[in-house]
Amino acid sequence: DMLFDMGFIRDLERIVKLTPPKRQTLLFSATIPAEVQQQAAKWLRNPDAIDITPEAIPIKLINQKIYFVERDVKDQMLIQYLCSTPRGRTMVFVRTRMDADRVGRNLTKVGLTAVSLHGEKAQAKRKRAITDFKSDEPPILVATDVAARGLDISSVSHVINYSVPEFPEIYIHRVGRTGRAGAKGEAITLCCSDERYHLGRIEELVDMKLPTAEWPFEDFPDLPHLEKAYHRKKTGHD
């Protein structure tokens, strides 16, 4: 389903047109929104629908907190949290590849070891970033959702949602990367005013009110000049 957001639907349609009329077609999708249903009606003949029960939502073992913040101080708050919190392997999720690179540079600028991971990164650099993240001294991994899909890393201690995902299922995929194998996990979300709608949809899916908290640290430390986010009227997934 995320291929639609990446602009690959036309490629999929061309591929289907090149397949023989007499064939068996199987369609797999993590979610079945209206767009997927429309394509299924075009590509499949009298299909049997198989709905696999999703894995249990990892709520109990994960300490989740929502912090309501102003957008223009997200980077400062992220840096303060990372510098002030005892943590192990840490993933920071952002919405776009530009955010991944920018946030990674800002973390590096203040002395934190960080690498970015997104779909536009060269394959060799992506492999290196993943290898480094799996090492005994892992950098902070700043990743987009699409780029992080398929990563199987069991010992992530902290997940930080720099941006609230637009699709509630993605939130579960993100926070589910911590708290595995019975371990405790931490997942925090920095939510600004225009992201509260997405937060509400997440709470509907998990059927609970996610706990909110006051920011636990004092005034921001002196930081070097940080790159500001570039705001687009319409954002896409990278």
Segment roles from a protein language model:
Residues D1-E227:
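Conserved helicase RecA-like core
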Residues P224-D238:
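Non-catalytic terminal extensions of ATP-dependent helicases
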